[in-house]
UniProtKB/Swiss-Prot annotation:
Temperature-activity note from the record: Thermostable. Active from 25 to 100 degrees Celsius. Retains 80% of its maximal activity after heating for 2 hours at 100 degrees and retains around 30% of its maximal activity after heating for 4 hours at 100 degrees.
Official protein name in the record: 2S albumin-like cysteine protease inhibitor
One of the GO biological process terms: negative regulation of endopeptidase activity
Protein role: Cysteine protease inhibitor that likely functions in defense against insects by inhibiting cysteine proteases in the midgut of herbivore insects such as C.maculatus. Selectively inhibits cathepsin L, as well as papain, ficin and bromelain with lower efficiency. Shows antitumor activity, inhibiting the growth of prostate cancer cell lines PC3 and DU145, and the gastric cancer cell line Hs746T. No activity against cathepsin B or serine proteases (trypsin, human plasma kallikrein and elastase).
Record keywords, A-Z: Disulfide bond, Protease inhibitor
SS bonds (residue pairs): C12-C35, C36-C82, C48-C89
C-alpha cells in the first residue's frame, strides 16, 4: 500500500541520519517537524513498518558508518518525539 511506503519518510530519514544541512539546532528542529508531518500522514497501523523500512534504507546508504546505535534509537523514538501513536517502534537492528 503506497501510503505506507518508507520513501514517504524522506525528511525522517534525513533526521535519523543526522543530515540537518548546516549544523545543529534550529535546522534539526525544523527537520524533525517535517518528519512528524510525514509520519502523521501515515495510517497508524503501518507507521512502525514504514519507520523500520526507512531506517534500513538509511543504514544501507550509510553502510554502517558512524553512529549506528544513535540512528537506531532515533528511528525507534520517532513517533514518541512526534507525540503520535504508537509511541515507540520496535526495530530489529540490521
Amino acid at each position: 500500500e503506497r501510503r505506507c511506503d518508507p520513501r514517504r519518510l524522506s525528511d525522517c530519514e534525513d533526521f535519523v541520519r543526522g543530515r540537518s544541512k548546516g549544523g545543529r539546532g534550529e535546522k534539526e528542529c525544523r527537520l524533525s517537524e517535517r518528519c512528524c508531518t510525514e509520519l502523521q500522514k501515515m495510517p497508524r497501523e503501518c507507521r512502525c513498518e514504514a519507520v523500520e523500512g526507512m531506517y534500513k534504507e538509511a543504514e544501507r546508504k550509510e553502510r554502517g558508518e558512524g553512529e549506528q546505535r544513535q540512528r537506531l534509537e532515533r528511528a525507534r523514538a520517532l513517533p514518541g518525539l512526534c507525540s503520535i501513536e504508537p509511541s515507540y517502534c520496535e526495530i530489529r537492528p540490521s
